[in-house]
């Protein structure tokens, strides 16, 4: 053991003073040892013998060996504790910690064999006080239009937000299913329908300039749309609504007319078991022609075309007839 370490001075602490006088005091105690002093040890001899028996080469242990080994271990532990306590006082603490012992082992060469046994606790990086949160700007509503057809075709859904295309997916559907598509260019036609009291269904439609938009449904199939219900508390709820295709068999939308016009139409079905659709609104320069059949009965359709900004005053066309025998529904044209 050694007393080196640069301790001492007028301003030395109690631990440093005890360390300076440690080895002279130990040497004096060793010289004054008697046989009675070896009978009682501060460290239990049973543990010392157990440690010594861990070596496979040790077959027998003499009676004096555990006693001397216990005395040496006591001196070693006392010196290491004093050196660790110096580090504790430097950090202005009153409790000896594992890191203090590791620092004492690191600073003094005679304890190098303990570096792997008592490793120094490395400084861990500080934990983040606040987690990184990704803020997502609420996206504007994506507008779509739907088309119903009886022949197999591809479904192409394209959403546009602020003039840029964001998503695109293509898949194949079976005959009689709903086709939903979003063109990259064209005007937007919101269509609002009221189904029953307090129930409102809004379908936003868009089509390219100069192209016709058609929606057809085969016999027996259903069309599912989302309807908005305004409750008594003012909350808006969206629930799916199924419309029987036998009640709405053909829906035809003609080509848009030139100029800015507002077409407002009121559609009323006469079937007793059908749901009542009372209002359809078409905006931004497009004209709508619609026809509804149920079996052999053709329901009346009333449409009014007025320039944008003027009040609704005159009806446009009303027709009621039986469905032709060839199964093709007559088109309703506007004057």
UniProtKB/Swiss-Prot annotation:
Task: Return one Gene Ontology term, BP aspect.
Answer: regulation of transcription by RNA polymerase II
Record-annotated disulphide pairs: none
**Where is the protein found, in the record's own terms?**
Nucleus
UniProt xrefs under Gene3D superfamilies: Histone, subunit A
Q: Which molecular function GO terms apply here?
A: DNA binding; DNA-binding transcription activator activity, RNA polymerase II-specific; protein heterodimerization activity
Q: Which Pfam families match?
A: Histone
Q: Among its keywords, does the record have GTP-binding?
A: no
Keywords from the named record:
Activator, DNA-binding, Nucleus, Transcription, Transcription regulation
Q: Does the keyword DNA-binding apply?
A: yes
| Chief location category | nucleus
**Highest taxon in the source lineage:** Eukaryota
Stored InterPro entries: Histone-fold, Histone_H2A/H2B/H3, Transcr_DNA_Rep_Reg
Give me the segments passing through the membrane. none
An annotated GO cellular component: nucleus
UniProt similarity note: Belongs to the NFYC/HAP5 subunit family.
| Subunit structure of this chain's protein | Heterotrimeric transcription factor composed of three components, NF-YA, NF-YB and NF-YC. NF-YB and NF-YC must interact and dimerize for NF-YA association and DNA binding.
The protein's role, per its UniProt record: Component of the sequence-specific heterotrimeric transcription factor (NF-Y) which specifically recognizes a 5'-CCAAT-3' box motif found in the promoters of its target genes. NF-Y can function as both an activator and a repressor, depending on its interacting cofactors.
Q: What is this protein called?
A: Nuclear transcription factor Y subunit gamma
Q: Which gene is the coding source of this polypeptide chain?
A: NFYC
């Amino acid at each position: 053991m050694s007393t080196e370490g640069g301790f001492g001075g007028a301003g030395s602490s109690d631990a440093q003073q005890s360390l300076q006088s440690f080895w002279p005091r130990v040497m004096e105690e060793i010289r004054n040892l008697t046989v009675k002093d070896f009978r009682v040890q501060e460290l239990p001899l049973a543990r010392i013998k157990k440690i010594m028996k861990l070596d496979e080469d040790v077959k027998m242990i003499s009676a004096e060996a555990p006693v001397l080994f216990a005395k040496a271990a006591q001196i070693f532990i006392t010196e290491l504790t004093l050196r660790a306590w110096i580090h504790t006082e430097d950090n202005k603490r009153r409790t000896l910690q594992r890191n203090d012992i590791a620092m004492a082992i690191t600073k003094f060469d005679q304890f190098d064999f303990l570096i792997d046994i008592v490793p120094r606790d490395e400084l861990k990086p500080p934990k983040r006080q606040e987690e990184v949160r990704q803020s997502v700007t609420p996206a504007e509503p994506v507008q779509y239009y739907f088309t119903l057809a009886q022949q197999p075709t591809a479904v192409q859904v394209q959403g546009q937000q602020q003039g840029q295309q964001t998503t695109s997916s293509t898949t194949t559907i079976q005959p009689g299913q709903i086709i939903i598509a979003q063109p990259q260019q064209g005007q937007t036609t919101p269509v609002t329908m009221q189904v029953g009291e307090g129930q409102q269904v809004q379908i936003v439609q868009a089509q390219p300039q100069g192209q016709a938009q058609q929606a057809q449904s085969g016999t027996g199939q259903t069309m599912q749309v989302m309807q908005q219900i305004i409750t008594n508390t003012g909350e808006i709820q969206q629930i799916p609504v199924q419309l029987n295709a036998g009640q709405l068999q053909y829906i035809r939308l003609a080509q848009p007319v030139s100029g800015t016009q507002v077409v407002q139409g009121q559609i009323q079905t006469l079937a007793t078991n059908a749901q009542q659709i009372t209002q359809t609104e078409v905006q931004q320069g497009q004209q709508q022609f619609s026809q509804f059949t149920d079996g052999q009965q053709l329901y009346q359709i009333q449409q009014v075309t007025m320039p944008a900004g003027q009040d609704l005053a005159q009806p446009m066309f009303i027709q009621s007839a039986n469905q032709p025998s060839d199964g093709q529904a007559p088109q309703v044209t506007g004057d």
